[in-house]
Amino acid sequence: MTPIRARYLSVVLVAAAVGFASGSASAALAQGMPTTGPDVTVVDIYDIDSYGGANGFHGYAVGTTSCNIGDDELNWCNTGSCGGGLSSKQHPVIAQNLYRLKAGRFEQIGMSWLKHGFFATNKGNAQTCKVGTSCITPPLGFQQLGIGCTDTYWAGLNGDQPLGPRSEVNATTSNFIFPYTNVGFSQVYDQRVKVADADVDPAQNAGALYWVEGQYVSDNDAAAGNGLNNASYRKATVSPGTFALNMEPDNPPGYFATVREHSAIHAWPAIDPAVELFYVDVPGAVIERFEVARKVTAVDGDTWHYEYAIHNVNSDRSARAFSVDFADPTPISAAGFHDIDSHSGEPYSTADWTPVATPGTGTVSWSTSTFASDPNANALRWATLYSFWFDADAPPSTAVQTIELFKPGSPTAVTFTFPLFSDGFQSHNLTAWSAAVP
C-alpha cells in the first residue's frame, strides 16, 4: 500500500467542569493493529461508475470491497428472518465521498446517500484482507461477514437508486431507521455522489488532485470500539469532456492504490509533508472522532496563511462551530469557508457558516445555528469534511483551536493545539517528522 507521510496524533479528551475538554498527545495510531470483536474496513475501492450529468451536476458511485479484520463475525442482516437473534437493522451501510486538493486547499466536493448491505458473499483473499488468515465461513452464512472474509459491492450496487438517507443513521452506534425512507429520485445524480461540473472540469481545475472514499458503518463493529478505521480512499482522475472518474491503477505489482483504514483527509499530508494532521476524540461509550488537518504558510515576515480541513469520522453529536484563538489581538483577514451540501431531499440546511473575525480579539470563528434552535442546521455531520482558511499576523505556535459540538451532551466543546509543530517550523523542514506508517 501507499505509505502515509507525517505523524498522526490522537488526543483523548476529558471533560472539565466548564464543559470544555483538554488533552495531551499520545502515541501515533498504527494501521493494522490486532483488534477484538468484529472489525470491518474497506480493503479496496473496487471500481467507479460515472452516470453522466444534468443541470450542472454529475453523478458517480464507488465500488467497495470490505473485509472483517477482527476476531468475531460482523452482522449482515436486512431481512426479518435472520438467525442468531439478528434483526433487519443489523447490517452495514456504505457511504461514498469525493475530495479535491486544489491550490493548497483540501475540500470535499461530493457525497452520496447510503447503500444498505443485504448479502455477504464471504470470499477469501489472504493478500488483501487479513494477512495470514483464511476466510472462516460464519455460522449464519451470508447474514454475517466471517473472520478474514471479504465482500464486494461494485459501483453499480452502491449507486443503485433508491439509496438510504444519511440523516436516518447514527454513525456512532450504527442505529438507524430500516426500512429506510424512500423519497424517490428523478436525476442521474440523485442520492449518488453528486458533484458540480465546475469542481471536476479539467479546464477549470488545472493541477487539482482527486480521491474517492468509501466508509462502512456497522452496529457490532461500533459496539466493539472498532468504528474508527472503517474508511479507505483511492486516488482518481477526471476525463476531459465526459467528466468520467477513473481509479488510479494497482501498479506496479505489490502496490495497492487503495489506502486502507484511513479516511481521505490523510491524502493531504501524504502529498504535502508540511500538513499537520491531528485526531480529536470526544469521550463516551463509543469514541467519536474528528480529524483536523492544518497547513500554515508564511506569506511574509509578519503574516501567515492558514488552511484547515475538519473531517467528522463518526460523531453523531456533530459540530456546529470552529474557532481559532491567538494569544494576542492579532489582525485577521481573508477568512473563508467551504462545505459540502446535503442533497436529494435530506432535511438539512445548506447555509454556509459565516466567518467572524472581531477586531481586537485575535479570534476568528465560524458557526451554524444551535441544535435547540434548528435540529436540521448545517452541522458538520459524520463522513463529511468542511474547510476553513484565513490570514493572520501571528505564527501557528500561538493558535488554540476549538470545535463546538452540535447535539447536547458533555463536553460541549473540545479545545486543542498542534503540539507536534508548536514552534511553527517556519523553515518548513519537516523531514524529522516524516515517516511511513505501517
Give the role of each language-model region.
Residues 294, 298-316:
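Short beta-strand elements of extracellular/lumenal beta-sandwich folds
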Residues 20-61, 211, 228-266, 419-438:
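Boundary/junction segments of secreted and surface-exposed precursor proteins
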Residues 10-24:
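Bacterial N-terminal signal peptides
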Residues 36-239:
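Solvent-exposed N-terminal domain segments of exported/luminal and surface proteins
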Residues 176-181, 345-385:
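Extracellular adhesion/glycan-binding regions together with long Ser/Thr-
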Residues 250-301:
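Low-complexity, acidic Ser/Thr/Pro/Gly-rich terminal tails and inter-domain linkers that flank the onset
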Residues 183-204, 367-398:
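Low-complexity, intrinsically disordered segments enriched in Ser/Thr together with acidic residues
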Residues 321-350:
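Solvent-exposed beta-hairpin/edge-strand motifs
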